[in-house]
Design a protein with these regions (language model features):
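Broad hydrophobic/π-residue packing in well-ordered secondary structure
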Residues: 1, 48-49, 55, 61-65, ...
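Active-site-proximal helices and loops of the catalytic beta/alpha 8
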Residues: 7-19, 25, 35-41, 88-167
Length: 167
């Protein structure tokens, strides 16, 4: 693949490849604008998406994780099908040479600590995706949300990989 060839070439020069992963939203303003690379089983299953008619304007932690931001199609990251899709994507990146990830819009994905609407997205996706290689280390990441709530999560990641969570 072109991605693998790029990673191989970068590694020849000691350059690490960090993938900008967008795991919670896709497209721009409507489902009609979804990327053609999204499989039909994701695109056409309404249970995998948050209600696009509900917009989040950072009113609450619930709203920024359960509603769409300015009408951008937002995946239901608590759904196991969505989690498996994310795991598959991240594993393919690692298997093809990615050294780490920057997670765009991480604050828009619920955590286990979100009372009443939390999910295991982060622990499940990061652990399963990164354990495709045998070495692992525990990494504690502090995620600070716009509502000034702090949640500490323990992640499992491949040793020598870089995980950045973009807020």
């Amino acid at each position: 693949s072109q991605f693998k060839a790029m990673c191989d070439e970068a590694h020849k020069y000691g350059v690490k490849v960090v993938v900008d992963a967008v795991l919670n939203h896709m497209g721009n303003k409507s489902k009609n604008d979804l990327s053609p690379c999204i499989p039909d089983e994701i695109r056409n299953n309404s249970s995998l998406w948050h209600d696009i008619s509900k917009n989040s304007w950072y009113a609450s932690r619930h709203d920024i994780t359960q509603y769409c931001m300015d009408g951008i199609p937002d995946l239901n990251t608590s759904n196991k099908t969505v989690q498996n899709y994310a795991i598959k994507f991240l594993k393919e990146c690692v298997d093809n040479g990615a050294d780490g990830f920057r997670f765009d819009g991480a604050k828009h994905i619920e955590t286990p600590a979100d009372s009443g609407f939390g999910s295991d997205f982060w622990p499940t996706v990061l652990q399963q995706a990164m354990l495709s290689q045998q070495e692992a280390l525990h990494l504690s990441i502090m995620v600070k949300f716009l509502i000034k709530q702090q949640v500490t999560m323990t992640k499992v990641t491949v040793s020598q990989s870089l995980i950045l969570i973009h807020l």
